[in-house]
């Protein structure tokens, strides 16, 4: 009986000694099975900076904003252009009754101008706009002209309530936007104007040469 009791005690001691060693592989396997943060998105889906693991270094730039790709900038710029066209279209509906709805016309037109300018800023890129906002770059003439025309339009519509000045401010906004958008072209604004005027003159000369 003494030998049986001693063998039972030895068996229990061996079981207690081998229990932590057997538990460690289970914990290790469980930790290995857990995916990293952001891995559930898959390799084909965009991985945002806030879904990264703690071992990875933080991305360069602002932590509160995700990195915007070129395709996302194009989509956002196109959406801003569509909204700007919608605002311009609604403002055009108020053009026949401009004397009665001058304030709504100015607000819609100004909002369309702001959206069109935001589209141009998105297409240009965030670093360039950041340098402009920090004062590292001098604002262009089109930027200053647009800001002045926008402020004058809002002042004329909301404060002075002058129809003539509101219409002049809206025309100045359109001119500033066209000048800015032409300046964003790769070949420059002067070359684009020359090409447009050359095609216009060519079409006019051809129309004059054709018999009526």
Curated annotation (Swiss-Prot):
Keywords: Membrane, Protein transport, Transmembrane, Transmembrane helix, Transport. It comes from the Eukaryota. Residues 100-104, 166-174 are lumenal. It is a multi-pass membrane protein. Pfam families: Got1. It is found in: Membrane. May be involved in fusion of retrograde transport vesicles derived from an endocytic compartment with the Golgi complex. Belongs to the SFT2 family. This is Vesicle transport protein SFT2C. The gene is Sft2d3.
């Amino acid at each position: 009986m003494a030998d049986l009791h001693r063998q039972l005690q030895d068996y229990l001691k061996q079981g207690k000694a081998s229990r932590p060693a057997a538990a460690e592989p289970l914990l290790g396997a469980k930790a290995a099975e857990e995916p990293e943060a952001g891995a559930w998105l898959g390799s084909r889906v965009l991985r945002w900076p806030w879904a990264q693991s703690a071992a990875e270094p933080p991305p360069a730039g602002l932590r509160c904003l995700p990195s915007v790709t070129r395709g996302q900038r194009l989509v956002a710029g196109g959406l801003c252009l569509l909204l700007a066209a919608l605002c311009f279209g609604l403002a055009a509906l108020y053009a026949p009754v401009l004397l009665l709805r001058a304030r709504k016309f100015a607000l819609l037109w100004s909002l369309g101008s702001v959206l069109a300018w935001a589209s141009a800023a998105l297409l240009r890129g965030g670093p360039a706009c950041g340098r402009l906002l920090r004062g590292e770059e001098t604002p262009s003439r089109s930027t200053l002209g647009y800001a002045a025309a926008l402020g004058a339009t809002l002042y004329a519509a909301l404060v002075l309530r002058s129809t003539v000045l509101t219409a002049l401010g809206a025309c100045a906004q359109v001119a500033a936007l066209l000048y800015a958008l032409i300046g964003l072209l790769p070949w420059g604004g002067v070359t684009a104007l020359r090409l447009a005027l050359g095609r216009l003159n060519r079409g006019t000369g051809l129309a004059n040469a054709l018999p009526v």
